[in-house]
Every structure is written in structure tokens, then in C-alpha cells.
């Protein structure tokens, strides 16, 4: 089992964003069922956010507090990672000590004493504040015992090195999927391997593109109706999607050849790339989909299959940015 800051976690984690960050959040009964199922299957690295809600922004944390109030016996079984450090209204990062401190304290307050905050990470790096300044602030919370450890999200390899020199970095969260493999070449995977820092892979299905449910432009438009923010992302533009269809079809063909679903293949590929370093955190709002995701652990990708997949997929260029031109500047800072 992977280890994050001395805590044994399952090889596939669980992202909670989709349970609350939408106009109508998942009812508690349904959310608790999914959370309990994930935990029962060993998926105990839970990824949450201080701002993962609409009304109020803290809905994700409030859901967790209600969950642990109902299931206090599960608090010590879960490793809880929470992202914060963003202005709720603008979602702009603020790495100043006062702002970061208030963010950590707000997360702790909303958990209402039901669960310790295991890992805190700023969701994005504030380019106007030296990373050392932000890390010194968070180190103070570790030293006081208010949080167990510190993580980083959407950072560059150089920032990881600088931050790690101030406080041990327990995990680095980045987007990583068959569509977004930047970390293999931009130094992030190399520095994390060198420093033995686990990589937490968010959006391992590229926000739905790798689930097997989106095969045509019509499918894309229908899918995006449930997630309005997708229309702002490059790869959900019908024109860009059409250019990426050959790649998607190649993924589907490889999955079938290897006796897997697209989600299973997508997870196993990035896990194999990390060679034990990568922990994907797919999200889900249903037990059936969570079960489907975790079924990847019942399959395996042989070294020969992994090599074949890399060779096949390298023939297809990927079109579109991970987000869009406006948001690109907030990534890998």
C-alpha cells in the first residue's frame, strides 16, 4: 500500500468535489453511501476542498463534518486532504501568511472536531508570494499539531524543491491522465521520485472524456449540460473534441484489446507510469461508478501491454489546453 506521511492509503483514492460543487449537491444519504463504500474497499485517501461548494462554498467540509458525526468510527480510517488558500469569490490564490492561516483555521472549524485535518495544501500557488513564506506558515500548523502534514497542488518542479526545503512535502497533487501527461516531461515526476513524494492524480478521466460515455460531439454536448463549467475548457469545445476523437478511439481499442473498460485502462496506465508513485483520486456520486473505478485493482497492465500502449498513443497528438488560455497561468507555478 502507498504511504502518505506515515499513513497507509489505498492505491486509488476518492475525490469528493463532485458531491457538492454543483448547483444541487448530492443528498447526504446518497453521498454517505458512496463514501462508506469507497472506504470499505480501501479507498481511504479522501480529497476535499474548502471552496468545493456553491451555497455555501464550504459545503464539502460541512458534508464531511456531518459524515464523521454519523460515523465517528471512520475518522481514524480516513486520510483527509483539503485544498484551500483561494478567495471564495474570485478563486484567486493568496499565499500571504494571514490569508493562509485563516484558511487552515476555517477548514478546522468547519470540520467541527469530527476529524483531524491530515493534510492541507493551497489549491494554487500565489505567484506574488515566495513559496517559502507560505510554507513557513503551514509548518507552524504542523509544529503545533493542528495539521499532520503539508501538500502542494499544481506546482512546478522548482517550487516543489523550494517548498520541500522548508517543510517536508507529503504529497503533490496535479492533473494527470492519458490526456494530460505533462508531469512525465516537465520534471515533476522526476523530482517527486527523487524526494519520494507521492503524486496525487486528479481528473484521471479528464473530466469524463475517458469514461467511455462520450464518443460523439452530441454525447459531449449532452454530458456538458450537467457540468456547465466544462464549456469553458478547451477540450470540451466541439471543434477540439473532434480533433481528439482519433486519440479517444485508440484508447478505447487498447482497453478492449487488454480486456478492460476505458476507466480501468486509464487508471492502470497512469499508475504504471508512476511505478507506485501515483495515487489517482477519481470522484463519483454513485456506488456503481465507484465500484467500476475500483475494479481497476482487479486487473493488471503487463509491462508489454504498457509499452504497446505508450507506442500506440504516441502516434496521436493531443489538442487543446488542460483548462484554457486564461487559466493556464495558474498551473504548474
UniProtKB/Swiss-Prot annotation:
Q: Could you describe the subunit structure of this protein?
A: Monomer.
Q: Please give the organism.
A: Schizosaccharomyces pombe (strain 972 / ATCC 24843)
Signal sequence span per UniProt? Answer: none
Q: Record's family?
A: Belongs to the aldo/keto reductase family.
The pathway where this protein functions is:
Cofactor degradation; B6 vitamer degradation; pyridoxal from pyridoxine (dehydrogenase route): step 1/1
Q: State its Enzyme Commission number(s).
A: 1.1.1.65
List cellular component terms (GO): cytoplasm; cytosol; nucleus
For this UniProt entry, the molecular function terms from Gene Ontology, in alphabetical order, are: aldo-keto reductase (NADPH) activity; oxidoreductase activity; pyridoxine:NADP 4-dehydrogenase activity
Record's keyword terms, sorted: Cytoplasm, NADP, Oxidoreductase, Phosphoprotein
Compartments it resides in? Cytoplasm
In Swiss-Prot or TrEMBL terms, this protein is called Pyridoxal reductase
The pH note for this entry is: Optimum pH is 6.5-7.5 for the reverse reaction.
Biological process terms from the Gene Ontology for this record are: pyridoxal biosynthetic process; vitamin B6 catabolic process
- Spell out the reaction equation it catalyses: pyridoxine + NADP(+) = pyridoxal + NADPH + H(+)
- Domain of life, per lineage: Eukaryota
Cite the InterPro entries for this sequence: Aldo-Keto_reductase (IPR050791), NADP_OxRdtase_dom (IPR023210), NADP_OxRdtase_dom_sf (IPR036812)
The function of this protein is: Catalyzes the reduction of pyridoxal (PL) with NADPH and oxidation of pyridoxine (PN) with NADP(+).
- The reply on keyword rRNA-binding is no
Sequence positions bearing Phosphoserine: 292
What positions constitute the catalytic site?
Answer: 52 (proton donor)
Q: Which Pfam families match?
A: Aldo_ket_red
Amino acid at each position: 500500500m502507498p504511504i502518505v506521511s506515515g499513513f497507509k492509503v489505498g492505491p486509488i483514492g476518492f475525490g469528493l468535489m463532485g458531491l457538492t460543487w454543483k448547483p444541487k449537491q448530492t443528498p447526504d444519504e446518497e453521498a454517505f453511501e458512496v463514501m462508506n463504500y469507497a472506504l470499505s474497499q480501501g479507498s481511504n485517501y479522501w480529497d476535499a476542498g474548502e471552496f468545493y461548494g456553491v451555497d455555501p462554498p464550504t459545503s464539502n467540509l460541512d458534508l464531511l463534518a456531518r459524515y464523521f458525526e454519523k460515523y465517528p468510527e471512520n475518522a481514524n480510517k480516513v486520510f483527509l486532504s483539503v485544498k484551500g488558500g483561494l478567495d471564495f469569490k474570485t478563486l484567486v490564490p493568496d499565499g500571504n501568511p494571514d490569508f493562509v492561516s485563516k484558511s487552515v483555521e476555517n477548514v478546522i472549524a468547519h470540520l467541527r472536531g469530527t476529524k483531524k485535518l491530515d493534510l492541507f495544501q493551497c489549491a494554487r500557488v500565489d505567484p506574488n508570494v515566495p513559496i517559502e513564506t507560505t510554507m513557513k506558515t503551514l509548518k507552524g500548523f504542523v509544529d503545533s499539531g493542528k495539521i499532520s502534514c503539508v501538500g502542494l497542488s499544481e506546482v512546478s518542479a522548482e517550487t516543489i524543491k523550494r517548498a520541500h526545503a522548508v517543510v517536508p512535502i507529503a504529497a503533490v497533487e496535479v492533473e494527470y491522465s492519458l490526456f494530460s501527461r505533462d508531469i512525465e516531461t516537465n520534471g515533476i515526476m522526476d523530482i517527486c521520485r527523487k524526494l519520494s513524494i507521492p503524486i496525487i492524480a486528479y481528473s484521471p478521466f479528464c473530466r469524463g472524456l475517458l469514461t467511455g460515455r462520450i464518443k460523439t460531439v452530441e454525447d459531449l454536448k449532452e454530458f456538458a449540460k450537467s457540468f456547465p463549467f466544462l464549456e469553458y475548457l478547451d477540450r470540451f469545445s466541439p471543434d477540439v473534441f473532434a480533433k481528439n476523437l482519433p486519440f479517444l478511439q485508440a484508447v478505447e481499442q487498447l482497453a478492449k484489446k487488454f480486456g478492460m473498460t476505458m476507466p480501468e485502462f486509464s487508471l492502470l496506465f497512469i499508475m504504471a507510469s508512476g511505478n507506485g508513485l501515483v495515487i489517482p483520486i477519481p470522484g463519483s456520486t454513485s456506488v456503481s461508478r465507484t465500484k467500476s473505478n475500483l475494479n481497476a485493482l482487479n486487473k493488471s497492465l503487463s509491462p508489454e501491454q504498457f509499452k504497446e500502449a505508450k507506442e500506440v498513443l504516441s502516434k496521436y497528438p493531443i489538442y487543446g489546453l488542460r483548462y484554457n488560455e486564461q487559466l493556464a497561468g495558474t498551473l504548474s507555478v
